[in-house]
Amino acid sequence: VEFTTPDKPEIKTEATVNGEKEVDPLEEVTIIDTVSYSGLVPGKPYKISGILMDKSTREKLLVDGKEVTAEVEFTPENATGSVEIPFTFNASTLAGKSIVVFETLYQEDVEVFVHADINDKSQTITIRGLGGLVIKKTAEDNFVEGISFLITGKDYSKKFKTDKNGEIRVEGLAPGEYTVTEISDKVTARYE
């Protein structure tokens, strides 16, 4: 009599955002976690639950005070295959953070495999940091204080005035293209 034992369930994963490992700190970001599995029993229901972790703190990532989780239920046709788990969240306050996806595979509510490696590069997404810029106004008569500039970009429009050195320093800008326009007002009217 021969006995065959089923393969032990395993999962391997790859997390990306539009195929990339880095993303801008946007209000809506969707990480797609592609979970490749093997050793599952065809025709049996499974569930994969995932949670996002903050790599620097090694704690569950909180966005607006809530954990970011997702789960997918599926019934495999074959012992091997893959499923995608989408995690959609607001990343606008997460600039500079690295996020790691952890998953747990369940069969009929019984945990059968856990993938929870905080250092797994295939599971890590980096939120790009914010940038800044410096504007330096020059003039032949050295009159550079109080000159107005408008900086505009995607979802951004703000007016600034130069300091006594003719400079404006702007921090906290999301990556992207910006337009800097000198504005004519009563201070700059002397140049017209």
Language-model regions: role of each:
Residues 1-192:
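Solvent-exposed loop/turn and edge beta-strand elements of beta-rich ligand-binding domains
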